[in-house]
Amino acid sequence: MTGYEARLITFGTWMYFVNKEQLARAGFYAIGQEDKVQCFHCGGGLANWKPKEDPWEQHAKWYPGCKYLLEEKGHEYINNIHLTRSLEGALVQTTKKTPSLTKRINDTIFPNPMLQEAIRMGFDFKDVKKIMEERIQTSGSNYKTLEVLVADLVSAQKDTTENESNQTSLQREISPEEPLRRLQDEKLCKICMDRHIAVVFIPCGHLVTCKQCAEAVDRCPMCSAVIDFKQRVFMS
């Protein structure tokens, strides 16, 4: 499906809102299920097309890390799409940030190649943007290394999961030793139950194994998802 003509053929008697030639040029091909399409390069899927929607814009909106998209449209195009969405969202939300501060933060975030790299690794755009904004507001500068960014993203995801779990656990009594035991168990590798967890699996985001055990698996032991990338993290 790397060729335009090959993708175009898949649309056959396409009768939906969006022009099939535009879809094919944007890297998409029809998968034979209603108006569902998929990018030949990044594998990203889209459906439920609305009138006048632009395939390139939707590609950039949902899959900004796609290398085909980057080669064809460039970083500036992708950044402008997300900047426009951010500014539109700011118009309908009450916020304490001034317009000049919002622009300064966005000007710092969007050109940063680590934004695209984190998205390519499977992290959600909104999560990456949010944590970068918080970093700039607290320290005055963006992340310097991808490793620190990934570690903070994983930590934020872990905190969210723990907060949801804590709401349930507060409904039942636990012994004084239980929190300490649980904390110790959470830090142990779920395979060897001996060493501390030290690797996050991408794209599922699970942090469940030590470095040694991570090297021996191709699928996440927690959810069985295929592992595309293994990121070393350092737990405090």
Curated annotation (Swiss-Prot):
Molecular-function annotations in GO: cysteine-type endopeptidase inhibitor activity involved in apoptotic process; ubiquitin protein ligase activity; zinc ion binding
Source species, domain of life: Eukaryota
Coiled coil segments of this chain: none
Main location (coarse class): cytoplasm
Gene3D superfamilies tied to this protein: DNA helicase RuvA subunit, C-terminal domain, Inhibitor Of Apoptosis Protein (2mihbC-IAP-1), Chain A, Zinc/RING finger domain, C3HC4 (zinc finger)
Record SUPFAM superfamilies: Inhibitor of apoptosis (IAP) repeat
Location(s) in or outside the cell: Cytoplasm
Binding site for Zn(2+): C39, C42, H59, C66
Zinc finger (RING-type): 189-224
Intervals holding BIR repeats: 7-70
Keywords assigned: Apoptosis, Cytoplasm, Metal-binding, Zinc, Zinc-finger
One GO CC term, this protein: cytoplasm
InterPro entries attached to this UniProt entry: BIR_rpt (IPR001370), BIRC2-3-like_UBA (IPR048875), IAP (IPR050784), XIAP/BIRC8_UBA (IPR042579), Znf_RING (IPR001841), Znf_RING/FYVE/PHD (IPR013083)
A single BP term in Gene Ontology: apoptotic process
Pfam families: BIR (PF00653), UBA_BIRC2-3 (PF21290), zf-C3HC4_3 (PF13920)
Database matches in PANTHER family: BACULOVIRAL IAP REPEAT-CONTAINING PROTEIN 8, INHIBITOR OF APOPTOSIS
Function as written in the Swiss-Prot or TrEMBL entry: Protects against apoptosis mediated by BAX.
Assembly and oligomerization: Binds to caspase-9.
Family: Belongs to the IAP family.
Protein name: Baculoviral IAP repeat-containing protein 8
Organism this protein belongs to: Pan troglodytes
Gene behind the chain: BIRC8
